[in-house]
Amino acid sequence: MFAWLMGLKSISPAGLHRLMQDKPVTAIDVNSRQSWVQARVPGALNLDPAGYDEKNLPADKDSLLVFYCSNPLCRKAPNAARRAKQMGYGNVHVMSAGITGWLNAKLPTESGE
């Protein structure tokens, strides 16, 4: 919801999962480190939504970035995605359903450090 209001592209958990089968995707979890350790989208980075910079992201500004947080009411992912757009990244999406939506869709996860 917040992604759309901020003019960002939104993607569903199933849509992200399909994309991950076909092309390189940088999934970015902006939840707490503890939450990231418990369950995350496979291969997802864990970044502080307010404290990351370009060195934490791929060098290629055309890379596909997908930000997510906990659930549709969370504003951290849209805010972090907007920040990436301001840094010049053009292919930025938000998985608005968050990790909750990913888990509810019974999609594969990773856990641990």
Language model features: what each stretch is:
Residues 1-38, 111-113:
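Flexible, polar/low-complexity N-terminal or interdomain linker segments that lie immediately upstream
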Residues 10, 27, 44-46, 92-94:
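Conserved beta-strand scaffold positions in the cores of enzyme catalytic domains, especially
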Residues 18, 53-62:
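Short amphipathic alpha-helix with an adjacent loop that forms part of the alpha/beta core around
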Residues 36-42, 57-59, 102:
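Short loop/helix-cap segments at secondary-structure boundaries that form the rim of catalytic
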Residues 41-43, 88-89:
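Short helix-loop-beta junction
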Residues 45-46, 63, 109-113:
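Short, hinge-like loop/turn segments at secondary-structure boundaries
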Residues 47-53:
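Glycine-rich, highly charged phosphate/nucleotide-binding loops
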Residues 59-103:
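Catalytic cysteine-centered active loop of the rhodanese-like fold, especially the PTP/DSP P-loop
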